[in-house]
């Protein structure tokens, strides 16, 4: 009986170790890295203009999609201008809540319009794992765009 149990136990420990190592090696972006992505996106936006910047933000596996981090953007009313999920582009997300009912888009837009930048936390479907997870997003308003990037929290 011990021999039958040892293989599944070793498999579980190996799986946990691989997952832990992946986090330790930086496969999961951090809030600091999310903020850095926003700052990098703003530099690109200011240097190349909004049309080219939005095109680059929307490019699959482009400069602004790294690990599990990605830049997304909306206008001051909540209409999405850039997002890895192309179905969201052009859609007004202002009233759309997170999976727990929190109006996080509204919070991002309102704070960006009143303060210019900040952080908002919410629960979101992780596009890599397919599971609900806590996320914190940094955003900054530049002209008529709100540039955002969020990191999933452990």
What are these regions (language model features)?
Residues 2, 7-9, 13-154:
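N-terminal membrane-sensor/transducer module of prokaryotic signaling receptors
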């Amino acid at each position: 009986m011990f021999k039958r149990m040892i293989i599944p136990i070793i498999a579980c420990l190996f799986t946990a170790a691989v997952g832990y190592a992946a986090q330790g090696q930086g496969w999961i972006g951090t809030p600091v890295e999310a903020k850095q992505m926003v700052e990098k996106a703003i530099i690109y936006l200011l240097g190349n203009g909004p049309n080219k910047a939005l095109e680059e933000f929307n490019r699959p596996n482009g400069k602004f999609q790294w690990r599990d981090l990605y830049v997304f953007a909306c206008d001051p009313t909540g209409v999405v201008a850039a997002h890895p999920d192309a179905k969201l582009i052009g859609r007004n997300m202002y009233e759309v809540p997170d999976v727990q009912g929190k109006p996080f888009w509204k919070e991002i837009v309102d704070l960006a319009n009143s303060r210019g930048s900040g952080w908002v936390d919410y629960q979101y479907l992780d596009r890599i794992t397919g599971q609900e997870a806590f996320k914190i997003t940094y955003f900054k308003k530049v002209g008529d765009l709100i540039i955002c990037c969020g990191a999933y929290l452990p």
